[in-house]
Amino acid sequence: MFQTAWRQEPVTFEDVAVYFTQNEWASLDSVQRALYREVMLENYANVASLAFPFTTPVLVSQLEQGELPWGLDPWEPMGREALRGICPGDEARTEKEGLTPKDHVSKETESFRLMVGGLPGNVSQHLDFGSSLEQPQGHWIIKTKSKRRHFTDTSARHHEAYEVKNGEKFEKLGKNISVSTQLTTNQTNPSGQISYECGQCGRYFIQMADFHRHEKCHTGEKSFECKECGKYFRYNSLLIRHQIIHTGKKPFKCKECGKGLSSDTALIQHQRIHTGEKPYECKECGKAFSSSSVFLQHQRFHTGEKLYECNECWKTFSCSSSFTVHQRMHTGEKPYECKECGKRLSSNTALTQHQRIHTGEKPFECKECGKAFNQKITLIQHQRVHTGEKPYECKVCGKTFSWCGRFILHQKLHTQKTPVQA
């Protein structure tokens, strides 16, 4: 019988995280990696929902962005802390047998174990990759080639797992379902389990829920909606992080200027204003950017790709956020309200710029003369005074301008009709 002793101190993500080295990650197949990714993001969402202030773990950022989740050696001190408590008695048994933690895990199981839950109200469960699960009478039975483990799931948490029966039927938590009539597109993988194959990339999934979540990566579907502003997100963890914006909480402080930000990602991007760091460089034109999202939007200028089209005016956009803000011009929606004066605005960016009127903040400073501005575009236009750049050229007379506004006013001189002389 597996029992969990709940701790009284606040739960952190490290309490429910498992780390892999590069070699260990390479030994996992696609199904195991997908399961690991879903479990870690779910655990992070559960921890984040407890409202304890903490920085988004590097592991979570890697998983959300589709990066390889390794780089920290789990057998270093931090990794050992994250793995400690995977199974009560494992650490003591390891010392008794004279094995290193790494040797112990490799000998104990044929593959890696994940910790699911670990929070009050859920029982920590150890899932052996490649195992099949059954749930008779409130108990989980984990089948492996070497042993069976039993423990009680007091939270009645359900996980789907499928096992072939007589070549035609499989069990879904004890329910027999015909493969031929209900799951005609499914495949049987080498381990003998029913799996779902992605038609886009060929990946297999044992759980239908995991398969449907994976499909959203190809379709771009975002099923988690913010009730405050209507914005959609692909993962619940991203929604939770976004909702902090509406609460007004800004727990992350910039040490340079003291500005508070709602997320650690926003803090990192903000700090690049002070450092001037621009790690994302365009290979087409050499232009560098401090934000990866802005960099991706810029690349679409070279490719001409515009994925979003407005049904009202048929204008197209290369960026989903610009498309969303544009649609509010037609609907009149202004979901962002200034707490100082009550003015409502159509985008979070417009709200941030507006709030600088009240705070007097001018975060964009010219390195040539030290003059500061409250908008980045104003700084860019100002810098042309020093560089002499005039990117706006009149096709009628060839005159050039450094400011877009002056260029537009000049064009009107050519479009105005000349009065007819008597």
UniProtKB/Swiss-Prot annotation:
Transmembrane segments: none annotated. It is found in: Nucleus. One of its GO terms (cellular component) is nucleus. The keyword Zinc applies. Residues 11-82 form the KRAB domain. One of its GO terms (molecular function) is DNA-binding transcription factor activity, RNA polymerase II-specific. InterPro entries: KRAB, KRAB_dom_sf, Znf_C2H2_sf, Znf_C2H2_type. Its main location: nucleus. A zinc finger (C2H2-type) spans 196-218, 224-246, 252-274, 280-302, 308-330, 336-358, 364-386, 392-414. Keywords: DNA-binding, Metal-binding, Nucleus, Repeat, Transcription, Transcription regulation, Zinc, Zinc-finger. Gene3D superfamilies: 6.10.140.140, Classic Zinc Finger. One of its GO terms (biological process) is regulation of transcription by RNA polymerase II. May be involved in transcriptional regulation. PANTHER family: ZINC FINGER PROTEIN, ZINC FINGER PROTEIN 771. Belongs to the krueppel C2H2-type zinc-finger protein family. This is Zinc finger protein 620. It comes from Homo sapiens (Human). The lineage of its organism: Eukaryota, Metazoa, Chordata, Craniata, Vertebrata.
